[in-house]
Amino acid sequence: MFILRQAEISDIDVIMQIEKDSFVPAIMERREVFEQRLNVFPEGFIIFEDSKNHRSAGYICTELWDCIPSDKDFFAVGHDIKKLHNANGSALYISSFALLKEFRGAGNGKMLFGSALNFFKEKFNTENALLMVNEEWNAARRIYESYGFRKYMVFESAFPAVSGSGFSCGIIMKKSFSANAE
């Protein structure tokens, strides 16, 4: 069982631990980037806490955008949240979602992603949600697809390849929250 709570600046060390456990160095966010996101939009940054021992298991970080940009730079690691974030934005951008390895593989990722998505949908009343995922991260893509996310656009060479040689595409996935969903 997990508790979803708003992240705080005091969580930065555990956020960085989760980040290091989840991503290769080339796509890890810097501490300063997370600090900026916590300062600009704290309501959009959630920690997943194990309710049994109150240990942080993962996080999800979001932004609110007025539109969906077509420029890859807005989706890049280290992008400046202040360039597109608008507290009244209609698009929920999920900039990062990560779990410690020890909490993966038991359905926790799917359950926590769904819980967070429902929380954000109700709290911010957005029209749609979007995220970018490495084309090679099949387990993550299955989670997102199970909640209605579909391929919206593709950016070539957006991620280092899992093999360590070359690059792989970044897939922008989108989900509509409207009654007339796509």
In which residue ranges do the predicted regions lie?
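Conserved acetyl-CoA-binding loop-helix of GNAT-fold acetyltransferases
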Residues: L99, G105-F119, R142, S146
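Conserved beta-strand-loop-alpha-helix junction that forms the acyl-donor binding cleft
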Residues: K101-R104, A129-R141, S157-S168
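A short beta-loop-alpha structural element at the N-terminal edge
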Residues: F2-I15
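Conserved GNAT acetyl-CoA-binding A-motif
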Residues: L92, F113, F120-V133
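Conserved active-site alpha-helix within GNAT-family acetyltransferase domains
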Residues: K110, E122, E135-M153
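Active-site rim helix/loop that mediates acceptor-substrate recognition in acyltransferases
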Residues: P25-S51, A57-C67, H79-K83
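Conserved acyl-donor/pantetheine-binding loop and adjacent beta-alpha core of acyl/acetyltransferases
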Residues: C61-S96, S157-G166
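Glycine-rich phosphate/pyrophosphate-binding loop shared by adenosine-nucleotide-utilizing enzymes
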Residues: F2, N53-Y59, L92
